[in-house]
Regions:
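Vicinal oxygen chelate
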Residues: 1-14, 24-25, 31-121, 132-162
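Short acidic-aromatic low-complexity motifs
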Residues: 17-21
Length: 162
């Protein structure tokens, strides 16, 4: 019998998805996730709880279950949350996620805050920023760059037409 010896971090995201089994496979393919453990309803195959590690981060997820108040972004019509995932190379990470089925919303771009960032939507309605640092930028310099960007009419999002 195995025991639960995992040291939980102070905060872990808990994602609700439609078809958790497919989501688990997507996160493995897109982000190199490793599965810690899974609780499955033997009668339906539904995932009641699974824990994954993604690049050193602990993520939990479960199948949508409206009876428990768990609805996925697909059922809600979107999400107000975006996850920031630090990666070795944003270009490679975005390509890998796209190959696994993600939609690239913003291609890898050098950003004013000193990161190269890409924005993706996964097939389950969750949004992710894949990024790596390309330069050290002080808070003061970041504010100057932000002000200049806004003054120029730039939205800061290369995929935006606004």
């Amino acid at each position: 019998m195995s025991t639960n010896s995992f040291a939980y971090p102070p905060m872990s995201p808990y994602l609700t998805v439609k078809d958790a089994n497919k989501a688990i496979e997507f996160y493995k393919a897109a982000f190199g996730a490793t599965e810690i453990f899974r609780l499955t309803d033997a009668s339906t195959g539904a995932v009641g709880h699974v824990e994954l590690m993604v690049n050193g981060s602990h993520i939990m997820l479960a199948d949508e279950n409206p009876a428990w108040g768990n609805k996925s972004p697909l059922s809600l019509g979107g999400t107000a949350v975006s996850f920031s995932l630090m990666v070795e190379n944003a270009d490679t990470a975005a390509e890998r996620a796209s190959a696994a089925g993600a939609t690239v919303e913003m291609p890898p771009t050098d950003m004013f805050y000193g990161f190269r960032s890409a924005s993706i939507s996964d097939p389950f309605g969750h949004k992710w920023m894949l990024q790596h640092q390309i330069e050290n930028v002080s808070h003061e310099e970041m504010q100057k760059r932000w002000d200049a960007m806004l003054a120029s009419g730039d939205t800061g999002c290369p995929s935006s037409d606004k």
